[in-house]
Amino acid sequence: MGSEMCIRDSLWKCIENRGESNKRTLAGNICESNELIDENNWFFNNILVDLVNQYASSFINLGNTVPTSCRHSYVLDTMWVNFQKQNEFNPVHNHSGVYSFVVWMKIPTTSSEQNSNPIARDSNLPCIGNFAFQYQNIVGDIKSFYYEMSPEMEGGMVLFPSKLMHAVYPFFNCQEERISISGNISLDTSNALF
């Protein structure tokens, strides 16, 4: 629990010290998104490197699929914070880089309360307020995997291949913001490993 609080505190500090607007580079239909600085590469070195290594040992090292003439280390290329208000959303999109991540810092709604709204109540695909990955299965069907949002997801994180399509659905009837941090991990082509 102590290390989780340390990580969250570090990320909240990044948010407090946020930089310029990042909206022009994002697919999001949201009012506020800002660049973040990972001071002294703390988050990258203490969290992301281990997660990338775990992903590579469990599945495949996606960096090996990038055509380069030599090996390169990873670098946290970009990191930003999104302040999502009700009715705002991120349409289906992917990212640049090799790996991407999202950390949910504040979730003011629950999936169950959102899906009790009249527009979703009788839906055969209730998804408002959720985060979703979209992918093609082995027979070519487009499928979705949903993360049902709730305050219990605060501090949760997902690392995924940057090219994996994903979306953030809007939430309704809540004046509080949803706050999330996202970023892209790329190969550092300025530094070759031999």
List each language-model region with its residue ranges.
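Catalytic core of non-heme Fe(II) oxygenases with the double-stranded beta-helix
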Residues: 78-157, 176, 191
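Double-stranded beta-helix
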Residues: 183-194
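Short, compositionally biased
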Residues: 171-181
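Signature of the catalytic double-stranded beta-helix
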Residues: 26-97
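Long protein-protein interaction modules used by eukaryotic assembly/scaffold proteins
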Residues: 15-23, 154, 189
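Short, small-residue-biased leader/transition segments that mark boundaries at the very start
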Residues: 1-7
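Short beta-strand His + acidic residue motifs that chelate non-heme Fe in jelly-roll/DSBH
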Residues: 90-93, 166-172
